[in-house]
Amino acid sequence: MQAQPIHARLMNGEVLSQDDATAFMREVMSGDMSGVRMAAALAALRVRGETPEEIAGFAQAMRESAVTVKVRPRDVLMDVVGTGGDGAHTFNISTTTAFVLAGAGVPIAKHGNRAASSRAGSADVLEALGVNLDASPEVIQEAIDTLGVGFMFARNYHPALRHAAPVRSDLAARTVFNILGPLSNPAGATHLVVGVFRADLTRTLAEALRHLGAKGATVVYGDGLDEFTVCGPNTVSGLRDGEIIDRTMHPEEFGVDLHPKTAIVGGSPAENAEITHALLTGGGTPAQKDIVALNAGAALRTAGRVGTIREGVEQAREVMKGGQGWEMLQKYGALTKR
């Protein structure tokens, strides 16, 4: 008897192995799957909820189909990225954090896009800061290998996603694609801090990253934000040495004050670029400085560069005061325009 096609198995409630999930997504990425079959499968997954193995399999196929950035091997290559879709309209916290980390000497391969639910995504604000988003993969590779930082504009690195775009648009609802971007870094990031839009996703994505071979990861839901928040508790799943630990973290544990959500709201790309510039040159408001320091501190701990998040927060504050992150951003912007 002929085996059922994967989309039919999903519609029947079957859970896929990681290999079968990869096979399904390869068919999507190749353009060989009809829109009806794709929509049925995505809807079935949405209703049931994706397993870590399925998410890892889908992400593996996305990685295979991506344009890659062939950086030299290293022990740590970090991405700090959110799924987007939190609707909080904050300034560009993860983008600012990435350059603080680069200023602290952590190699960064940031992967991002234009705005999902805010007015300015990472690509929008970096463009406003003078970065050429369309720099070639070879230029990005050179930037990561020589400067220690690079930004990959997702649209340019995942051309096969065009095959899923019409169905995603027609469904007009979140699907597994909304969480795959952070898991599909074209440079092969080894360590990640991933922000998610629902608390129940932290463990799921940490397990998926373990299946994908990540050396270290921190997945966080920040009380309504897809990053660490300074406005309330953080739901965190941390992957270290193959073990995953779930916990709730409060900003005060790390020497960071609590602030209202209104204190971290952003605006247009130009307005957010001004905030990023201020923070990377020792300025910014207390809330802005605290939330970037907390996110950078957690990333420094994830990368193994400090023993505790509190130590990381203090190091991040020193980098912001010293302007090393801004220096990195200026050098990177110039390199992308060559």
UniProtKB/Swiss-Prot annotation:
Assigned GO CC terms: cytosol
Q: Where does Mg(2+) 1 bind?
A: S94, E227
Q: Where does anthranilate 1 bind?
A: G82, N113
Q: Which GO terms describe its molecular function?
A: anthranilate phosphoribosyltransferase activity; magnesium ion binding
Cofactor(s) essential for the protein: Mg(2+)
Q: Where does the chain bind anthranilate 2?
A: R168
EC id? 2.4.2.18
Give the highest taxon in the source lineage. Bacteria
For this protein, what does the record note about how its cofactor is bound? Binds 2 magnesium ions per monomer.
GO terms for biological process, alphabetical:
L-tryptophan biosynthetic process
* Alphabetized UniProt keyword annotations: Amino-acid biosynthesis, Aromatic amino acid biosynthesis, Glycosyltransferase, Magnesium, Metal-binding, Transferase, Tryptophan biosynthesis
Q: Which InterPro entries match?
A: Anthranilate_Pribosyl_Tfrase, Glycosyl_Trfase_fam3, Glycosyl_Trfase_fam3_N_dom, Glycosyl_Trfase_fam3_N_dom_sf, Nuc_phospho_transferase
Which residues are listed for Mg(2+) 2 binding in this entry? D226, E227
Q: List the Pfam families hit by this protein, alphabetically.
A: Glycos_trans_3N, Glycos_transf_3
Q: Which positions does UniProt annotate for 5-phospho-alpha-D-ribose 1-diphosphate binding?
A: 82, 85-86, 90, 92-95, 110-118, 122
Catalytic reaction(s) noted: N-(5-phospho-beta-D-ribosyl)anthranilate + diphosphate = 5-phospho-alpha-D-ribose 1-diphosphate + anthranilate
Pathway of this protein? Amino-acid biosynthesis; L-tryptophan biosynthesis; L-tryptophan from chorismate: step 2/5
The top EC class is transferase
Q: Tell me how this protein assembles.
A: Homodimer.
Family recorded in the similarity comment: Belongs to the anthranilate phosphoribosyltransferase family.
Read off the NCBIfam families from this record: trpD
Function, as annotated, reads: Catalyzes the transfer of the phosphoribosyl group of 5-phosphorylribose-1-pyrophosphate (PRPP) to anthranilate to yield N-(5'-phosphoribosyl)-anthranilate (PRA).
Protein name in the entry: Anthranilate phosphoribosyltransferase
* Organism listed in the record: Deinococcus radiodurans (strain ATCC 13939 / DSM 20539 / JCM 16871 / CCUG 27074 / LMG 4051 / NBRC 15346 / NCIMB 9279 / VKM B-1422 / R1)
